Amino acid sequence: MSHKVKIYDTCIGCTQCVRACPLDVLEMVPWDGCKAAQIASSPRTEDCVGCKRCETACPTDFLSIRVYLGAETTRSMGLAY
């Protein structure tokens, strides 16, 4: 599937999204932009099934992680216009 996983710089490095992902799409990498000195990364987006558990787990008000579903998924779910 061709989903895109975008990590925003509002990430607080809490690891909740990494732990919520059932397919290990995400991992933490070093980053100086937050107190935790790490940020989520999505090196294996080809394994993403679009469950959005990472989005649900994110504790920030900004949804620091977003999954953008591929066209084939939105069509099959009846979400395409």
UniProtKB/Swiss-Prot annotation:
PROSITE patterns: 4FE4S_FER_1, 4FE4S_FER_2. One of its GO terms (molecular function) is electron transfer activity. The gene is psaC. Pfam families: Fer4_7. Its cofactor is [4Fe-4S] cluster. GO terms for cellular component: photosystem I; plasma membrane-derived thylakoid membrane. The cyanobacterial PSI reaction center is composed of one copy each of PsaA,B,C,D,E,F,I,J,K,L,M and X, and forms trimeric complexes. It catalyses: reduced [plastocyanin] + hnu + oxidized [2Fe-2S]-[ferredoxin] = oxidized [plastocyanin] + reduced [2Fe-2S]-[ferredoxin]. [4Fe-4S] cluster 2 binds at residues 21, 48, 51, 54. Gene3D superfamilies: 3.30.70.20. Its EC number is 1.97.1.12. This is Photosystem I iron-sulfur center. Apoprotein for the two 4Fe-4S centers FA and FB of photosystem I (PSI); essential for photochemical activity. FB is the terminal electron acceptor of PSI, donating electrons to ferredoxin. The C-terminus interacts with PsaA/B/D and helps assemble the protein into the PSI complex. Required for binding of PsaD and PsaE to PSI. PSI is a plastocyanin/cytochrome c6-ferredoxin oxidoreductase, converting photonic excitation into a charge separation, which transfers an electron from the donor P700 chlorophyll pair to the spectroscopically characterized acceptors A0, A1, FX, FA and FB in turn. It is a peripheral membrane protein. Binds 2 [4Fe-4S] clusters. Cluster 2 is most probably the spectroscopically characterized electron acceptor FA and cluster 1 is most probably FB. It comes from Rippkaea orientalis (strain PCC 8801 / RF-1).
